[in-house]
Amino acid sequence: MRSTKVIHIVGCHAEGEVGDVIVGGVAPPPGKTVWEQSRFIASDETLRNFVLNEPRGGVFRHVNLLVPPKDPRAQMGFIIMEPADTPPMSGSNSICVSTVLLDSGIIPMQEPVTRMVLEAPGGLIEVEAECRNGKAERISVRNVPSFADRLNASLEVEGLGTITVDTAYGGDSFVIVDAASIGMKIEPGQARELAEIGVKITKAANEQLGFRHPEKDWNHISFCQITEPVTRDGDILTGVNTVAIRPAKLDRSPTGTGCSARMAVLHAKGQMKVGERFIGKSVLGTEFHCRLDKTLELGGKPAISPIISGRAWVTGTSQLMLDPSDPFPSGYRLSDTWPNMPE
């Protein structure tokens, strides 16, 4: 068996969404900050293509690269690679990374609770892991500051007409739309149509509304979050959502950054108060338990500090290799599984 490279991966999923973790075989990319390192990964694309493209990956997969932290307060840094983006932050991926770090012993586990600080490209995140019998059973993450951007904006979408949307940031950027307003219901049997409509809405939102982060070089809307109405039981709000990820797939988890963005919008509209909780439910019925912990400012904008809580499970280990005679060293994409590819 010969190979010019060997990349060691621990497989993981958080509430259904795959977030594998590279634990060896890749040198840290250049950059003075984790954000700069993530921009190198995004522009270079060599690693992204190798681990995400077929035959080694697929559109279903997210992969995280562990890197030494740049901030002395953090125990570990990580860079998130999604099918179409290398984002500032991801809730499900941060839960996967935390679980792999503890379950594999890379960071020593302390039962019943392990606390650590991780450095995502978008900033530091505080992690609290509930641990028992050598397993990180639940991960709570204090997400990066999240904020509402545009509220009740009108958006023209081909085939849908004029719809009303909100835009917000929860560690990544979202256009948020009510499912009923576009004639949809969030259920597994409508996954393909939800994904395709969501990507179409994202494209229209980028063209007509745009987005600009006040501090990071993040100037586009990444995702469409399709929601069903929130219900309230005391100080607990519950809402079903699904997030369409380019090129056209649905997040299997409730999307931690999406829940954070949705809480920011609910707070901006006066529908959620500090200290209240939000249960986000995915298309699979899995849940993230969230809390609006406090308010703050980000670059002069009112923002919230959300906490996301969910579970993740290690699914296996693997080694990705490259035989020097392999005709597809960067892999490949076909439109049967990578929709909306340019012709």
From Swiss-Prot:
InterPro entries: Pro_racemase_fam (IPR008794)
Keywords: Isomerase
GO MF term list: 4-hydroxyproline epimerase activity; trans-L-3-hydroxyproline dehydratase activity
Major enzyme class: isomerase
Annotated catalysed reactions: trans-4-hydroxy-L-proline = cis-4-hydroxy-D-proline
EC identifiers of the protein: 5.1.1.8
Residues the record lists as binding substrate: G91, S92, D251, G256, T257
PANTHER family assigned to the protein according to its UniProt record, in alphabetical order: BIFUNCTIONAL TRANS-3-HYDROXY-L-PROLINE DEHYDRATASE_2-EPIMERASE, TRANS-3-HYDROXY-L-PROLINE DEHYDRATASE
Protein name: 4-hydroxyproline 2-epimerase 1
Organism the protein comes from: Brucella anthropi (strain ATCC 49188 / DSM 6882 / CCUG 24695 / JCM 21032 / LMG 3331 / NBRC 15819 / NCTC 12168 / Alc 37) (Ochrobactrum anthropi)
Taxonomy of the source species: Bacteria, Pseudomonadati, Pseudomonadota, Alphaproteobacteria, Hyphomicrobiales
